[in-house]
């Protein structure tokens, strides 16, 4: 059995596009549209590890993370406000991780694109 040990993200989006809003995503303002290109997915020991490219157009949504995520913004402007916290303005080159249970508001000021790595645990 051959095991793929390296996944290189293409410079431009490739492959099928997934359109559903992420789990825990509630639109507050505008009509944000999301597109996801998943470049890697692997189930292991009851968890799904996935990575790819995610895009979201302007709008505001509340989000409660049901997964762990690392992301790196490639383009756009995001105002991320943790529940009970101060707004953070993020742009190209900024990166962050969020733990399961993180909640807050995402205001996409200018269409964003990010590389992501997520880890979902069944349950």
Residues covered by each model-derived region:
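Short acidic-glycine-tyrosine-enriched beta hairpin
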Residues: 84-100
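Conserved short histidine dyad/triad with adjacent acidic residue
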Residues: 39-41, 48-65, 99-100
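Ligand-binding loop in jelly-roll beta-barrel domains
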Residues: 100-123
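Structural motif
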Residues: 60, 70, 77, 103, ...
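Short, conserved beta-strand element in jelly-roll/cupin
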Residues: 56, 65-80
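Short histidine-centered beta-strand/loop micro-motifs
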Residues: 52-53, 61-66, 82, 88-89, ...
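A short, N-terminal "cap"/entry segment at the start of jelly-roll beta-barrel domains
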Residues: 1-48
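Short hydrophobic/aromatic-rich beta-strand segments that constitute the beta-sheet cores
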Residues: 63, 80, 114-116
